[in-house]
Amino acid sequence: MSTGTVVQVIGAVVDVEFPQDAVPQVYDALKIVGEGSCNGLVLEVQQQLGGGVVRTIAMGTSDGLRRGLEVVNSGSPISVPVGTATLGRIMNVLGEPIDEAGAIGEEERYVIHRSAPSYEDQSNTTELLETGIKVIDLVCPFAKGGKVGLFGGAGVGKTVNMMELINNIAKAHSGLSVFAGVGERTREGNDFYYEMKDSGVLDKVAMVYGQMNEPPGNRLRVALTGLTMAEKFRDEGRDVLLFVDNIYRYTLAGTEVSALLGRMPSAVGYQPTLAEEMGVLQERITSTKTGSITSVQAVYVPADDLTDPSPATTFAHLDATVVLSRQIASLGIYPAVDPLDSTSRQLDPLVVGQEHYDVANGVQTVLQRYKELKDIIAILGMDELSDDDKMTVSRARKIERFLSQPFHVAEVFTGSPGKYVSLKDTIRGFKGILSGEFDHIPEQAFYMVGSIDEAVEKANKKK
């Protein structure tokens, strides 16, 4: 192991000089040997500047760093603990425990920079993953081993939706999950930990946090740390869920690092390597013939603009997109998923079956027609509509309300118990509304219920 010395410190960027014959490779992990808080600080090599000098990004605060400190080259990239020892634990980007519950006690460590599985190793089966959330199962069904994006602006419910998905899937499918908190609020990370503890599924979740207050290096690499842990479970032949909250902060950390390294920015100030950085992460999230990784990624949409380069680049990698709408949230309909904007490759009669496809299509057609009629209603009122259009509006309003659902993880706020609705019940309910079977039931009865039977029961009670 070669040693070098710190020659320049500019915030999170640290230049280190090594002997000419022992220059570290790009992505090698270096360790500071010093006193106080900076002792043991890990640096990741980003560039070789020539003359034995490498430019690195600090994986922690650079407070207390000074020129002349000794640096040791580990000779390999950052490695993190993997395997069942990580379940129920909270770790940082380096795989160190931050939950004060002792050492991880892992049997194996993987480096976080790995290549994606080859074409012949990848699997191509399409099996649906039931989430128990009506609007998702109906309009944008998830595939086992697929990639899903939860798109939304600030405060429309991305994290709550993600927590409900973890809760439902962990309970219904008893699968293992890895949660990577990338640049999100520490409070949310804390809430998530206790939510999992109270639900009794903590021993099936590994948590890796690199929160908002941490340096850009941590936030850029924490998604890779979580992914590496998920890859180990997949390679053992398990079906694993990878939750990333929030993939936009991963892009943002890349932008900060890119600027710190002096690269010329591209569109809207993003890093010129945006597509490549996103591809490196997303191509590794895939299913092989041994096991599957199903990933759900929250994607913050800056200023609710889906054409922003960051969400636009993410779109290309996803199988299903769940778009959360501020207008739907303002109506008090939660989850605030837009059924007309959300898409899924699985919504195909050959995959989901003809009945499911027809019902989903019918729901979207009715809602689209209602959207077109809203302007006429606003100007002329309901009385000017034809009988057919009046019926369409009535059914569309029932569908809108029936798309809402009480969540298990939101019981604390709403006071109503959460509901898991099977796909069969979801299709039956919407099919009934479309066929006119429930035309006699007032629209209020469809709001915040689980299955259609609950809506009927609610209507009977009101009588």
UniProtKB/Swiss-Prot annotation:
ATP binds at G152, G153, A154, G155, V156, G157, K158, T159. Gene3D superfamilies: 2.40.10.170, Bovine Mitochondrial F1-atpase, Atp Synthase Beta Chain, Chain D, domain 3 (1.10.1140.10), P-loop containing nucleotide triphosphate hydrolases (3.40.50.300). It is found in: Cell inner membrane. It catalyses: ATP + H2O + 4 H(+)(in) = ADP + phosphate + 5 H(+)(out). Its EC number is 7.1.2.2. It is a peripheral membrane protein. Keywords: ATP synthesis, ATP-binding, Cell inner membrane, Cell membrane, CF(1), Hydrogen ion transport, Ion transport, Membrane, Nucleotide-binding, Translocase, Transport. InterPro entries: AAA+_ATPase, ATP-synt_VA_C, ATP_synth_F1_bsu, ATPase_a/bsu_AS, ATPase_alpha/beta_chains, ATPase_F1/V1/A1_a/bsu_N, ATPase_F1/V1/A1_a/bsu_N_sf, ATPase_F1/V1/A1_a/bsu_nucl-bd. The keyword Translocase applies. Its main location: membrane. It comes from the Bacteria. SMART domains: AAA. GO terms for cellular component: plasma membrane; proton-transporting ATP synthase complex. One of its GO terms (molecular function) is proton-transporting ATP synthase activity, rotational mechanism. Belongs to the ATPase alpha/beta chains family. F-type ATPases have 2 components, CF(1) - the catalytic core - and CF(0) - the membrane proton channel. CF(1) has five subunits: alpha(3), beta(3), gamma(1), delta(1), epsilon(1). CF(0) has three main subunits: a(1), b(2) and c(9-12). The alpha and beta chains form an alternating ring which encloses part of the gamma chain. CF(1) is attached to CF(0) by a central stalk formed by the gamma and epsilon chains, while a peripheral stalk is formed by the delta and b chains. PANTHER family: ATP SYNTHASE, ATP SYNTHASE SUBUNIT BETA, MITOCHONDRIAL. HAMAP family: ATP_synth_beta_bact (MF_01347). Produces ATP from ADP in the presence of a proton gradient across the membrane. The catalytic sites are hosted primarily by the beta subunits. This is ATP synthase subunit beta. It comes from Shewanella sp. (strain MR-4). The gene is atpD.
